[in-house]
């Protein structure tokens, strides 16, 4: 099974397809709850790849949020309350964005991204967060 996953990752990497996947198109949470948004990374060198997270609010430009380079290199945003955190799980080749203490203004579409072939940035499909 591991060999199949590696082969698929390599083929997708060569053709530049399917490098990132956000399986949930949308998630709904209530105010003051937390949410986790996952991004599966189909790259042969996941452990050395920095995963970047962005959001886009309705009718606004992309906003850069956070990146994670290794499992121990999280860069929390939001002071002591850690409003936004990012992490990597090497076993599942997944990066997770966690947004805590949700407010209505957190409503947006969230995207993971990686740099591919130098300076070419590849984005996943995005996950729309709805806060009620």
UniProtKB/Swiss-Prot annotation:
InterPro entries linked to this entry: Ig-like_dom, Ig-like_dom_sf, Ig-like_fold, Ig_sub, Ig_V-set, TRG_var/const_region
Region listing for V segment, in residue ranges: 19-114
Region (J segment): 115-132
Endpoints of the signal sequence: 1-18
Zinc listed as a keyword: no
UniProt xrefs under SMART domains: IG, IGv
Annotated Gene Ontology cellular component terms: external side of plasma membrane; T cell receptor complex
Gene Ontology terms describing biological process: adaptive immune response
Keywords tagged on the record: Adaptive immunity, Immunity, Immunoglobulin domain, Receptor, Signal, T cell receptor
Presence of the UniProt keyword Ribosomal protein in the record: no
Protein name: T-cell receptor gamma chain V region DFL12
């Amino acid at each position: 099974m591991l060999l199949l996953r590696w082969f698929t990752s390599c083929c997708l990497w060569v053709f530049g397809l399917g490098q990132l996947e956000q399986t949930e198109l949308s998630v709904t949470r209530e105010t003051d709850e937390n949410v986790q948004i996952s991004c599966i990374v189909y790259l042969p060198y996941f452990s050395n790849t920095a995963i970047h997270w962005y959001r886009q609010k309705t009718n606004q430009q992309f906003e850069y949020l956070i990146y994670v380079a290794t499992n121990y290199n999280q860069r929390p945003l939001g002071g002591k309350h850690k409003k936004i955190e990012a992490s990597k799980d090497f076993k599942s080749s997944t990066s997770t964005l966690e947004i805590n203490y949700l407010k209505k203004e957190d409503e947006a579409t969230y995207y993971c991204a990686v740099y591919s072939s130098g300076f070419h940035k590849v984005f996943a499909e995005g996950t729309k967060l709805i806060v009620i």
